Amino acid sequence: FLVDINKVELREKENPVNTISIYEMRDVVDGYAFNYSLQEKNIPNLISNGEETLIKISELVVLDPAGMAEKYKLSLEELKNKTDFDLMVDQTAFNDRIQKGMLPTIDIQGHTFYVDIRMDMLRPKDDFLSKGIVFDEIDHYFSEEANAYIIPYNPKTREFQELDYDSILVFPKDLIAVQFPFQRDLDPIGWNRNGGWNIKEDLKRIGLKSHFEAKTIPWKETFLPQIITENLMVLKEKTIKKKLQNKSVSFSKKEQGSKGRKM
């Protein structure tokens, strides 16, 4: 297997499409470990039934020091005594989170929110009247396609605000659509603590940041146009049905009146 520093994986020399991601391996002292299928020459899946063996490899700084030095713009001398974790995880952000207890922040329409995993919310800074954005309330707004939340947001109250999807006919004027990452990506350390896992779990894969910027998404680029179109069609059908009913009632009354005069 070749060590691909840029893709963070092992690639079989004779079969380049066969790769093993470092992120799929377990972190152990001085390296990584994984179960290896001798038949598939890869990490076994759920239906594998061939012979397996436990493999342990050194860290990437040991396997390819020159490649790691080039990737992280360090000299080989500067690379000495550093671990994969030192290079792959922002150490300033890590120390701010662990040593100083600083919560990550995210900017939403010019206002700063704290990513508070313990309270299960994005908590607005210096705004005690706002209840902020509670993750449990926006669970159904997570987009698998975007791999992020896309929610209706009220910039005045600085809160998530649910829409009435059964009756909405136009884009809301006082609300905007904002997009931001899943809470594990916003604060992986807080996520690990809350789940009872090692605080360094998945940090090399996810990365670590102290601040994020939420994106504002035009309503026309969300799922809302489809819902509005469907509601307008339903409204049109109801209107037509009502007109037909009124016409039928009117005709019936006219017919009854005509019969009365004949009598």
Role assignments for model-derived ranges:
Residues 13-16, 48-50, 55, 98, ...:
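Classical N-terminal secretory signal peptides
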Residues 3, 115-119, 151, 240-263:
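Non-Sec secretion/translocation targeting segments of pathogen effectors
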Residues 42, 48-98:
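Charged, compositionally biased non-catalytic regions
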Residues 22-62, 136-240:
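Polybasic, proline/glycine-rich intrinsically disordered low-complexity segments
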Residues 2-5, 77-136:
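Long, contiguous regulatory modules within eukaryotic nuclear regulatory proteins
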Residues 68-69, 236-244:
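Long, compositionally biased, charged low-complexity segments
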Residues 2-19, 35-43, 51, 59-73, ...:
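Extracellular/lumenal glycan-associated surfaces
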